[in-house]
Structures are given as C-alpha cells and as structure tokens.
Amino acid sequence: MMPRTIIEKIWDQHVIKKGEGKPDLLYIDLHLIHEVTSPQAFEGLRQKNRKVRRPQNTFATMDHNIPTVNRFEIKDDVAKRQVSALERNCEEFGIRLADLSSVDQGIVHVIGPELGLTLPGKTIVCGDSHTSTHGAFGALAFGIGTSEVEHVLSTQTLWQQKPKTLEIRVDGKLQKGVTAKDVILAIIGKYGVKFGAGYVIEYTGEVFRNMSMDERMTVCNMSIEAGARAGLIAPDETTFEYVKTKKYAPKGEDFEKAVEEWKNLKTDPGAVYDRTIVMDGSAISPMVTWGINPGMVLPVDETIPGPEAFLQEDDKKEAQRAYEYMGLEPYKKIEDITIEHVFIGSCTNSRMTDLRQAAEMIKGQKVADGVRAIVVPGSQSVKIQAEKEGLHKIFIEAGFEWRESGCSMCLSMNNDVVPEGERCASTSNRNFEGRQGKGARTHLVSPAMAAMAAIHGRFVDVRKYYQETTAV
C-alpha cells in the first residue's frame, strides 16, 4: 500500500461507499448536538417518521444561548424555546443530554474531550463550525449544517468530498509568554483566512508536540479561521494520558488495545501532502487582531499597517472598512489601544490551562478602572476544578466576574454582549463585525494577553511580565 497521511487513513477507514468522482459516503462515529442547530433537524425526523439511527453515538448539551448568570432564568423567548426543544427531543429520541443541572454541561467542544467522547481516529460532526477542535486528538472532526444534522441523526452517515491534505510544520522553541493562541493567529496572519480552503490540516513539528491537549485544542479550533475544513494533530503519549481517565473512554484492557491501534494513527514516512508550510516557532510573538477578520493580526509590539501595505484593491477596501469599524487609525501602536471589556472564555480558550495562565497574570493585581472583565469556564467540570484550585478567588479579588459555563460573549446570542462602539480583548475565535454585539469591536488575544489588558486597560506585551518576574 502507498504511504498515507493520517488524514487519508481515517478517511479510508470510514468510507462506506466511494463516490467515484463524487463525494464519498462516510460513517460518523460521534455526533454532538446543541440547542441552536438541532431543532429543525428533529422536526424533519418527525415529518418523515424516522428514528435516530444510533442514539448511543449522539450526545447533546446546551451552550450557545444560555445565560452564564442565573442560568435557569432564560429571558429570551427564542432561547427558551430552543433549550426546551432540545430537552424534549433528547427524551423522545433517547439521546444523552447534559442539561443545565448536569455537572457534565458545558460548551460542546469542551465537554466532548473531557468526557472521553472524543477519541483518536473517530469521525466527529456537530452543527457548529468549530467542531475542528476535536482534531487535537487525532480525530477527523468538522462542522455541518442543519440539513446534514438531520441526515446524520437518521443514517449515522454523511456524503463528503475527500479533502486535500495540508501539513503545517512549526519547529523551534516558543518564547516565554507565547501561547498556542499566538501560534495559530500567527499562521493565519501570515497566510490569510482563505489559504486552507479545501484542505484538512495536519499540524506537525516540535511546537505542537510540546503542547498540552488544551493547547492543541486551541490550535485545531481555529483551523476554520484559516479557511480549512478541519485540522488535526496525530495522537501521542500526551493524548493517551489525557484520555485514559475520562468517563466514556475505554477502560483496562480495552484501553490498552485501543492505544495500540491509536499508535498507528500517524502519517507514514514518504507520504505526500498536497501542500506543506513550514514556520519557525521561536519567531512568533504574542499576537493581537486589529481588524475585522482573524487574518488582520499583528505582534503586540507593532503598529497598525497603513493602506500602502495592502497590494490588492479588495484588501485595501477591507482595510479601510476595518479602520472605520474598529475606530482605529493607520500606524497606531497596538500597545496604545485601550479597551473597555475583557472576555476570557469560548471553545477556543476556556479550559484549565487557559484559566491558570490568566490567573498567573492577575494574581495580586486589580482590573483597571473603566474595564469590565468576565471569566466564563468552558464547562461545569472546568468551573469545579478551577474553584478547587482557588482560581475563582484570584479572579474575583482582582475584579473579574466569575460565571457559569457557556458560550457567553463569544457571540451575541445570549445576555453577554459588548455595547456598540466599545472595545473587547477576547480569547474567542472570531472578530467579525457585530460578532460580540452590534458595533462591538473585538480584538482576539490569548488568555495571558487578555488578563494583562484587563489590568492595564490597554494591550501590553505579556513577555514583559516574564522579564520582570525573571529579574526578581
């Protein structure tokens, strides 16, 4: 057999029927659902008098539009109906549900891994674009639309076009203060928001190997912002150790057998990718987005580019729109940009590694006057663990609001929004116009950078913190 990439191996293992020039029919191992993109799919099943094909392969939670304060008091009528519909649909069709009273509840892309539902080699889908997060485990995971949600519920399969393969290799040692979020933002900043279109990315190299699972999830999460269908990292001992104790993961002998199989989930020597990109990790800085897409991003110690930096006419127009929407002038220093809000959370950066990183920055400090800062754990499990470690006390004493789990301020579908014209340092994944509220101005950063912005009321190079602590 010809040498294959891990992407090709997982794909080939799940093809039920080859399309012969058309999409292949894939078997889906795990289907994650939430309250926003599933109601119409269940209604479609009822209209066609169909059952859920494999309810044991489906898991549900509510996350997108739930409150993170007084979580049982949902005031928005649409949100209330969606949450009620999910409860009713899961009961009727026999699907496991982590509801608002469950310790398993959380953002769908946080709870899948922490419950051991996400495993190497699986095909995983969800009606949410950031399903690529689960690729951190060596799974082929991608978002689907509502009609596809219905198709998977009723057949446990999906027609999919086989993707091209893209290797992104990053070697070297990251500087102190440079995080997984900075790595993926640097990649998108260099190559743009469309370069991954038609590809599934495999992240390789020393930098990704040295990352924790939480950090790998951050990288794979934002594969979508690079335009890719999905992103993954081959499983290794870090992966196996993480999975070992999880609730739904194989146990005992079954786990050992699974690990032996998972060890084969790696790209063969001599396998050829359709494209390869190589970057030097040691050259990456803490990053801050300045514009209206994640590709408009710069190292924190640089200045906003002027119109002459954009060679294509469309790019010039996009930059002009960004200047106007974000209320920023060309050549302004990133470190001179002041903020009114800080959001630490989302499926990108709401896990224990993220909260510990932010807490380290703010311990003994106070949130700057005029800044509202909130921390939203990605799951109830993360919240419980953070409270065991006393992180909530560090945040609260500094002036942060400590919330219940949910998607929160990542998107303006719930009570947590940024007021029009105000600026937010956010650990989420999208800085589109209106993403955090009408007229809201979003700057994407790492948890450490967000924490520093909360303290200073503006963007500050987090590397200075490490220089100061080293000097002491």
Swiss-Prot record:
Its cofactor is [4Fe-4S] cluster. It catalyses: (2R,3S)-3-isopropylmalate = (2S)-2-isopropylmalate. It is an enzyme of class 4 (lyase). Keywords: 4Fe-4S, Amino-acid biosynthesis, Branched-chain amino acid biosynthesis, Iron, Iron-sulfur, Leucine biosynthesis, Lyase, Metal-binding. InterPro entries: 3-IsopropMal_deHydase_lsu, Acnase/IPM_dHydase_lsu_aba_1/3, Acoase/IPM_deHydtase_lsu_aba, Aconitase_4Fe-4S_BS, Aconitase_4Fe-4S_dom, IPM_dehydratase_rel_enz, IPMI_cat. Its EC number is 4.2.1.33. It holds the Pfam family Aconitase. GO terms for biological process: L-leucine biosynthetic process. Binds 1 [4Fe-4S] cluster per subunit. Pathway: Amino-acid biosynthesis; L-leucine biosynthesis; L-leucine from 3-methyl-2-oxobutanoate: step 2/4. One of its GO terms (molecular function) is 3-isopropylmalate dehydratase activity. It comes from the Bacteria. [4Fe-4S] cluster binds at residues 347, 407, 410. PANTHER family: 3-ISOPROPYLMALATE DEHYDRATASE, HOMOACONITASE, MITOCHONDRIAL-RELATED. Heterodimer of LeuC and LeuD. Belongs to the aconitase/IPM isomerase family. LeuC type 1 subfamily. Catalyzes the isomerization between 2-isopropylmalate and 3-isopropylmalate, via the formation of 2-isopropylmaleate. This is 3-isopropylmalate dehydratase large subunit. The lineage of its organism: Bacteria, Bacillati, Bacillota, Bacilli, Bacillales.
